[in-house]
Amino acid sequence: EEGFKLIMIRPDKVKMAKEMIVKAQSKLLIGTVISFPEGINSLDEKLAEALKAIEDGADELDYVCNYQAFKRGEIELVKEEVLKGTKLAFEHHKVAKWIIEVAALTDAQIIQISALIKNVVIPNFKEDFYFNVFVKSSTGFYQTENNLPNGATVPAVIMMLENASPLPVKAAGGVRTYEEAEEMIRLGAPRPFNRRGDRRNLLRQAGRRELVPAWG
């Protein structure tokens, strides 16, 4: 487990992973992605995919928000999917994360969509559930131009924190060194995510100190 809280896997692998974790008597959690990586599936498709993942043993659901619809001004569509996707997680005692794909958004849009998610969650769910609804920065798969970052950046995370609070923020993509992970945690994003190719390097840099980034 290497000190990691959670593994992130595709929905079709959740059942197999759950069986392996149970067999190993591990406490490792399973997270999976919904409507990955573009977030353009219909609401019904997203909910069906999420429910199947829950039934297969997923603990955390990382929905890709329909940020393209948001950019087109289809605000009610985005509000509805955030409400119903979060409600499904709430009813099954699961964590919901909403990936907003910061590399595809302007600063103003990052601010607006972070606030939108907060403003859907706060009036519709109990306060003790707020900390189970994350605003997450990135899929790590968005194609940028001119080699611009496609994951979490310090400015983007700050904007998310300032506008999503009290919902927690997850920094994903671009967190490749111990120092970067430490900076994200210091800012207030407690669970920086790094993909498989970087996690051993992070552990080596951390020297297995107390501060170890969560994978997921």
Residue ranges and their predicted role:
Residues 1-16, 61-79, 101, 135-149:
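Glycine-rich, proline-tolerant flexible connector loops at the mouths of alpha/beta enzymes
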Residues 4-60:
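Active-site cofactor/substrate anionic-group-binding motifs, chiefly glycine-
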Residues 11, 15-35, 75-97, 104, ...:
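Alpha-helix-loop-beta-strand connector modules within alpha/beta enzyme cores
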Residues 19-20, 42-43, 73-74, 107-111, ...:
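Short, well-ordered secondary-structure micro-motifs
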Residues 32-34, 55-70, 121-147, 173-213:
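Glycine-rich phosphate-binding active-site loops on the catalytic face of alpha/beta enzymes
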Residues 38-55, 105-116, 156-166, 175-191:
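Catalytic cores of alpha/beta
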Residues 40-44, 48, 72-76, 130, ...:
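Residues at secondary-structure transition points
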Residues 100-101, 107, 111-114, 132-140:
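Active-site pocket-lining segment
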